Amino acid sequence: IHVGRVVRNKTNINKGSISIGSAAVDLAEKHLGNLENKSVLVIGAGKMGKLVAKALAEKNLNAIFVANRTYYVAVELANDLNGHPVLFNELGKYVQTADLIISATGAPHYILNKERLEKTDGDFKDLLMIDIANPRDICEDVCELGVKLFNIDDLREIADENTKLRKKEFAEAENIIDEEFSLLKESFKLIGVEDI
């Protein structure tokens, strides 16, 4: 336990997200600051949507809204998160008030595009959208309205970079473990305990 604490304190081995869900949360915090009191809309309540929604729910959000084509699935996830389910055909109402939109559906076409956003009364200059769907859920033309849009490839790059950084820290962690083990062996010799 002591050695683990020393490794965590003296290295960056546990810094940076390596999962797509955590990378999405980190990216949101980087662009929006503290997520406390932010409003989030999660579109898609499948595996990836759940993963990101659960990571976001830990951030003391003002509100988390969950939309899914199958409404009862949205209700289940929203209940798990103390959030609010959204009917899929009412997305427009929630898009215009969200600070962050995460989209992770299995749709074969765009769910959100510039035309759909223009039909709402929203101001999208401060809106962050993260599209983790494959194929894409959000058309890049939303950026013409001032939306900051990131996709799953951006998140993979973040996760891959963090994985590389962690691997660099492994050597330092091994040195600390070897050093601590040597100190332990020496202390056992001093008190007369046989070699380990």
Please tell me what each predicted stretch does.
Residues I1-L35:
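Glycine/serine-rich phosphate-binding loop and adjoining beta1-alpha1 elements at the start
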Residues V3, K59, D80, I101-P108, ...:
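Conserved, well-folded catalytic cores of nucleic-acid-processing
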Residues K15, S19, I43, R69-Y72, ...:
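Conserved active-site and cofactor/substrate-binding residues in soluble primary-metabolism enzymes
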Residues V25, E29-L100:
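Glycine-rich phosphate/diphosphate-binding loop of Rossmann-like nucleotide-binding domains
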Residues K47, Y71-Y72, A107-P108, N134-P135, ...:
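Short, glycine-/Ser/Thr-/acidic-enriched flexible segments
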Residues A53-K54, A78-N79, N113-L117, E140-C143:
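Short amphipathic alpha-helical segments
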Residues L81-K114, G122-I130, N134-P135:
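Rossmann-like NAD(P)-binding element
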Residues E118-L128, I132-I196:
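Adenosine-phosphate binding glycine-rich loop
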